[in-house]
Amino acid sequence: MHLQGKPPSHCPVNADWLKRAWLCCMLLLMTACAAPQPLMLMPAPVLYRDGLVDPFAHLLPARRIPRMSIFYATNREPEITEQGLSYGNDIAQRLHLGQAVVQLGDENTQWNDLYEASITDQTGLLLPLKLHSVAQQARFPVGMAVPSAELTDEAQAYFAAINAELAEAQDREILVYVHGTKVDFLNSAALTAEIDHFSGRDYVGLAFAWPSHQNIFRYLIREDVHRAQASSDALATLLELLAEHTDAQRINVLAYSAGARVTSKALDQLRTKYSDESAYRLKSRLRIGTVIFAAADVELETFLDRLGSISDLSEQVVITVSDDDNALIAARHYMGGGSRTGEELAESAEEFFIHEHQITNIEIIDVSAGKLARGFDISGHHYWYRHPWISSDMVFLLRTGLRPDRRGLAFSELEGIWYLSDDYPEQVQRAAKKEMRGSW
């Protein structure tokens, strides 16, 4: 008998096993010693700098406050903390639905402070993010989508609240944000609020929070990989519920990192479930608009197996790739499975798939292309919202759903692949002024 995870004494010690074991030990040490980092407001997109585009000019005075109300759906079990209701790491068998309020800044932050931090270089203006309140409104069995007449009173109230906000929004659209690994419920709610805020508070934000742990070791040993995969049923249920019971014209999805595992599988499941329907009819019924895979941590082969289904269900599919995403490089080296969808290494295979299947609604944004002309790369794992150039494209895309040539992106030599040129700030500001006609 030998200990689990240790090579038996009669077998030669495998160098790859030793490397992974060493990494596990180092990650355990780092996660045990590292203090949780406070969440801070993302840098202002370059799109808004210089005052050429004001995303908040249209807001009524009542909405100019340093708080954001969002909706949420989670298959985390609820827990009571010192701050009140929240959701922990235990897996729930039901979908918990509710609303949360996120504070952008501290108790002394005024709207003018938040406004300044949202449209300028934030040196000295970093603002913390925290949950102000959480209110659960309903629970729903995973795997069921029922007619409105059969909804509980609580569920009807939840969808009625979404519809009330849709009626007041400039865009009658919902953004479902699916977070990555190593984060908690607060993180998923806060990032949803940030994205909604920086997009001009023009649609309804909804956080889908799956039960990831708050350390990378659980992901490395694939426990949270399995949790991500197992959460696809809950996300598929949510998307059907939103299509059935809300007035949203479009339901957009932003999947980040391991959230792409949840999202790609959920969309593939929905296509399989309704395989007898044409893509046109299903797309019209589910009303899934733009689906973004940002820094996606999904094995390329798995993702390509699902990409046809994703295309069938969505109006527009956007994949971001980088040549210097430290998290995806580490995942490829230490977890196996080959290139990740969000790596530049996967770009040629993705481009070939798109061309081979004659797909016209998928675009790839290579954030590393053009780096020599720009004088810098767009790197790291959080680049899609932390770097002010690519975050500009994300908020512009979510606000408008425009094609890349109308968002200020440059066309590469490869079909379907776009990048940010050295004059991107001027290009995106010019595009926004033209497309929005002076009004965000």
Which residues are covered by each model-predicted region?
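Lipolytic serine-hydrolase domain surface
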Residues: 39-149, 166-168, 189-193, 197-205, ...
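Bacterial N-terminal signal peptides that target proteins for export
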Residues: 3-22
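Short substrate-entry loop that stabilizes the transition state in hydrolases
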Residues: 184-186
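Alpha/beta-hydrolase fold active-site loops
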Residues: 173
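C-terminal motif of bacterial Sec signal peptides marking the signal peptidase cleavage site
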Residues: 31-32
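The conserved beta1-alpha1 loop
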Residues: 176-180
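Hydrolases whose catalytic domains are alpha/beta-hydrolase-1, hotdog thioesterase
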Residues: 262-266
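Gly/Ala-rich beta-loop-alpha elbow adjacent to hydrolase catalytic centers
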Residues: 255, 259
